[in-house]
Amino acid sequence: MKCDPSIAKLINNELSRQETHLELIASENFASKAVMEAQGSVLTNKYAEGLPNKRYYGGCEYIDGIEQLAIDRAKNLFGANWANVQPHSGAQANFAVFLSLLKPGDTIMGMDLSHGGHLTHGSPVNVSGKWFKTCHYEVDKKTEMLDMDAIRKKAIENQPKLIICGFSAYPRKIDFKAFRSIADEVNAYLLADIAHIAGLVASGLHPSPIPYCDVVTTTTHKTLRGPRGGLILSKDEEIGKKLDKAVFPGTQGGPLEHVIAAKAVAFQEASAPEFKIYSQKVISNAQVLSNQLQKRGISIVSKGTDNHIVLLDLRSIGMTGKVADQLVSDIKITANKNTVPFDPESPFVTSGLRLGSAALTTRGFNEQAFEDVGNIIADRLLNPNDEDIKENSINKVSELCNKFPLYSENI
C-alpha cells in the first residue's frame, strides 16, 4: 500500500494486535487467507442489483455464477430449500424478515437483551423496538436457562405475530422444536437468529432450526469463520420470494459481490470434514475454559456452556464487567463486558464478562492452552492490584501467542 502509508501502517498495527493478543470476543473469529483473497478481489468493482439472471445491470454473467454458487452452497450446508446471501449483516437480515412478515405495530417476542438477546430482537433503542410492539422472555432465575413453560405463558399472554429464538450471550442449546410448538399455538411466525452458533449448526453439533422455523437468519463470521456479512435461510420457498423482495429493493441496494464470493468460500470450507473437527474443539475448549474459571471461584452463567460462549458472573468476586474488561485488556486479552441475567448494573457497567472460544481455536489452541488461559484470567481478576502477577500474565500471553501463531504465512 505504497500509495497510502497512513492506512498501511494502521492495517499493519491491527495485524500485529491480532497476532499478539488473545482474542476472546465471542462474536469474532479469524477468516482464512482464501476468504480474505476473495473479499479483496476485483469483484469489489461490480454493481449487480437484483438476483442471479435477474439483474438491472449488464456484465453480470460471472457475478451470477459466483452468487448462485454461494446460494447453492448455503442451502446444502444448512439443508435449506431457499437462501439469500445478499444481506450486509445479521441486522440487515433481520430487518428484511420484519419487512416481509410484519406490519408496523405488530407484536414481536424475543429474548430480553440483558438475559442474552440481541438489539434487533425488540430493544427500544433499535428499529425493531420502535416500529413494533415488543415483549420479551427471560431465563429462569435459578437455572439461568430458558424455561419453555414460562415462554409459552408469555406468548399466550401477548399473542405475538413473530417469535424470535436466538441470542448474543446465551451459552446453552435452544430447543427449536419447543419454540415451534409455542409459535403454532399462538399462530406466530418463528424466526431463528443463529448468528452465534451457525458454525455449530452447520457441523451438526447444535440442533438445526431449519425443520422448525419459518425463517433463519445468521451472520457469516463468528463460528462460521467467513467474512463479516449476513445470510437468510428458509425451508419455505414462498416465504423466500417475499424475503428476496425485502432484501432488494426493500432494505438494500446493490449487493457486495466481493463479500458474497468470500461467503461462498467460507461455505465450502465449512462443508469439509475438518470444519466439524474444528467445531468440536470450539465447544470442548469453551467447556475447559468454563470449568477452569469455576475451579478458581468465578461464577459462570448457567454453570457451563454447550457452545462457544462462556459468560462470567462477576458478582461472585465483587467486580463489575467494566473493571474486568479493562483488567484483562491490560494483559493483552480482548473480551467484552456484558450484562448477566437479572443484572443490577447498567449496560455501560454490567456485572458480566463475555468470552468466546472460536477465534483462539482457529489459532490452534488446545484444551491445555485454554486451561492456561482460564488461569491467566483468574489470576488477573482475583489479584487486580498485584503488579507482579500482571507482568507475569503478560509474559504468559506472549508465550501462548508465539506458540500458536495466527497466520503461518504473510498476508
UniProtKB/Swiss-Prot annotation:
It catalyses: (6R)-5,10-methylene-5,6,7,8-tetrahydrofolate + glycine + H2O = (6S)-5,6,7,8-tetrahydrofolate + L-serine. Pfam families: SHMT. Keywords: Amino-acid biosynthesis, Cytoplasm, One-carbon metabolism, Pyridoxal phosphate, Transferase. CDD domains: SHMT. It comes from the Bacteria. The modification N6-(pyridoxal phosphate)lysine is found at K222. It is found in: Cytoplasm. One of its GO terms (biological process) is tetrahydrofolate interconversion. (6S)-5,6,7,8-tetrahydrofolate binds at L113, G117, H118, L119, E238, S346, P347, F348. Its EC number is 2.1.2.1. The record marks H221 as: Plays an important role in substrate specificity. The keyword Cytoplasm applies. GO terms for cellular component: cytosol. SUPFAM superfamilies: PLP-dependent transferases. It is an enzyme of class 2 (transferase). GO terms for molecular function: glycine hydroxymethyltransferase activity; pyridoxal phosphate binding. InterPro entries: PyrdxlP-dep_Trfase, PyrdxlP-dep_Trfase_major, PyrdxlP-dep_Trfase_small, Ser_HO-MeTrfase, Ser_HO-MeTrfase-like, Ser_HO-MeTrfase_PLP_BS, SHMT-like_dom. Its cofactor is pyridoxal 5'-phosphate. Pathway: One-carbon metabolism; tetrahydrofolate interconversion; Amino-acid biosynthesis; glycine biosynthesis; glycine from L-serine: step 1/1. Belongs to the SHMT family. Catalyzes the reversible interconversion of serine and glycine with tetrahydrofolate (THF) serving as the one-carbon carrier. This reaction serves as the major source of one-carbon groups required for the biosynthesis of purines, thymidylate, methionine, and other important biomolecules. Also exhibits THF-independent aldolase activity toward beta-hydroxyamino acids, producing glycine and aldehydes, via a retro-aldol mechanism. Homodimer. This is Serine hydroxymethyltransferase. The lineage of its organism: Bacteria, Bacillati, Cyanobacteriota, Cyanophyceae, Synechococcales.
